[in-house]
C-alpha cells in the first residue's frame, strides 16, 4: 500500500471515529443567559417498584437480568391496568377501595384505604416504563444503607417506640400526618402519588417546586455561604453551582425531624447532615438525579441514591391540599378531647 492511500484511509477512519463519538453526545439545551437548561415538569414515577435497598441476594449487581426485567415489566403493566380500569380486578386494592366507598365504609387507619399495602398504581401513579435498577441505593456497591452509629440506633429505637401510640397533643402527631413537609429526599423519592416536580430557572437562581406538599426550594448559584449554624429548617439551606452540565445543590442547616425515605420516613438525620444533589440532563426527556447523604452522627459512612426523573407529556402538577384548609388535625384533637370529657355512665 502506498503512503498517500494509507494516510487517506487513516484520516477517514479518524473522522469516522470522531463522528461516531459526537453522535453519542446529545447537545445540551441552554438558557438565554448560558446555563444548562433543566426547566420543565418532571416526575420520578418510573422508579416506582424499585426498592430503596437492594435485596441481599443481588449482591453488588445493580441491574436486572432480561428475565427479571420482563417480570418487572409485567407488574408495571398490571399497575397501569389498575389505574385505567380499577373495577376490572376484583382483588385489586383499588377495587376494594371503590367497593368500600360504595358501601359507605370508612377507609382503614392511615389513609391508605381498605388495603394498607402501598401498591403502585393504586391511586393513579404508575411507572410508565420498567426500571432495570435493583435498588435506589447505588453506593455503597452492595446497594444497602450503611450501618447506623450508636446515636443513629438510639434515634431509630425512639422512633419505633413512639409509633402508633395515642396522641394527646399536636406534638405527638408525625410530620407526615400534619402534612407539613416530606423533606428534601421525601419530596422526590417516588411513592403512590404526587411524584412531580417543576424546575424554573432565572439568572443566578434555580427554583424547584414539588408536587408533594407543594414545597418550593429557591437555590442561589452565586457562591454565597450557608446560613449560620444555629439555623435549622425542614428543607434546610440549599446553595448550588454548576459542574459542567450538572447542577450541584448542597443543603445544610437541616433540622432533625426528617429521614431519607419515602414521605420523609426512615431514621431521622442529625442537624449536622449535608445533602448533595446532582441534576444532569442526559436527554430531552430525562434528568439523572443523585442524592448523597453525609451524616456521620447517624450513619457510619456516606451513601447515595440515584434514579432518573423524566418529562412525560400531559403530566400536570395539581394543588396538594392534604387535609382541606389544614384543619383536620385541629378538628381531630377537638373531637377526641370532647369524647374524653364526656361523663362516664
Where are these regions (language model features)?
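PEST-like low-complexity, intrinsically disordered acidic/proline/serine-rich tracts
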Residues: 2-6, 18-345
